[in-house]
């Protein structure tokens, strides 16, 4: 009877020892946590690379919305420019990357009147509260589009957009024959967030 009791006690103790063996050590738990953390960071970076990119503002053509050397995040995955978007594009004519605001898309008629300081798209006046000052007709704009002493009319062609800088008096944009209409294949994405300087962090509109 004593032998049977000892055998039973030994069998009961065996699972306890097995459980003790299976319990991970603090080091194993730490390594598992680190592995999960690294994997999560990898996934986040992968998503960021495919969905977003960063760009640095160069110059004053988007003042007062954007300023020189600010850092922006733009989304580019499956992106189609829309009116009002702040877009980033390659300009083959200027041989540089430019940041402007999309005013018109393919098929739109854009009229800029410097006398009334207005921009209309398909006959509708834009609310441009983001402008810092009145527009001046002081540049050598492409005269092909001039329809009166103070106004210009642009018909946006297929696969193109018409874009302007928010700082209209210091911006080379679609009014300039050196830039013209921007082909959508040259649009890199839409600027959605300003992340630097940190005290100016915020969503763009």
Question: Where do the language-model regions lie?
Answer:
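Signal peptide cleavage region of secreted peptide precursors
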Residues: 54-58
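Hydrophobic membrane-insertion alpha-helices, especially the h-region
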Residues: 35-52
């Amino acid at each position: 009877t004593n032998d049977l009791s000892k055998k039973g006690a030994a069998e009961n103790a065996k699972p306890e020892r097995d459980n003790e063996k299976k319990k991970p050590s603090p080091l194993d738990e730490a390594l598992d946590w680190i592995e999960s953390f690294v994997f999560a960071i990898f996934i986040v970076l992968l998503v960021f690379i495919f969905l977003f990119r960063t760009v640095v503002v160069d110059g004053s053509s988007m003042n007062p919305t954007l300023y020189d050397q600010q850092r922006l995040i733009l989304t580019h995955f499956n992106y189609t420019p829309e009116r009002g978007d702040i877009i980033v594009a390659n300009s083959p004519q200027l041989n540089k990357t430019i940041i402007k605001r999309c005013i018109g898309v393919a098929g739109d008629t854009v009229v800029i009147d410097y006398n009334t300081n207005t921009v209309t798209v398909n006959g509708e006046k834009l609310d441009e509260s983001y402008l810092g000052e009145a527009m001046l007709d002081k540049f050598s704009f492409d005269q092909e589009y001039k329809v009166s002493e103070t106004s210009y009319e642009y018909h946006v062609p297929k696969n193109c957009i018409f874009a302007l800088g928010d700082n209209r008096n210091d911006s080379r944009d679609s009014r300039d024959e050196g830039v013209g209409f921007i082909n959508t294949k040259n649009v890199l994405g839409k600027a959605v967030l300003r992340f630097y300087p940190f005290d100016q962090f915020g969503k763009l509109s």
